[in-house]
């Protein structure tokens, strides 16, 4: 009796710890790709004046406008191809915590994170950490479903949130 209970508790803690490490590792990679990728694409807007127009003694760079139009097209493409009916974010992660179903809608989470990346890369004033926090909980949901794990929902949300925040601020551990 008691020995079996201890073994079950230890097994559960090990699984939760392993999931936390995996999520932390993957979210840190995605967070850095998100931030550096957006910076990379934004650098093209200021580095080039190929679409510069002179109007009333003022040079107007049209690259930011073109970048936003391309971003808008790509976001519509993401929305249609993934069937996203509404964008999701950290509030949806918190809401999912209070529901019977474990985790967030993976399709909406991935679509929302991709749309936020496209928006930030195109120059929109989109926060970086909100989408990354939601991606962390989306990834936690994906892994727990893929592995068939029944883990505590508080741990599920905390793994994603802590991983995204620590990675976003280049902290080694949350």
Q: Where do the language-model regions lie?
A:
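Alpha-helical transmembrane segments and immediately membrane-proximal extracytoplasmic
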Residues: 1-174
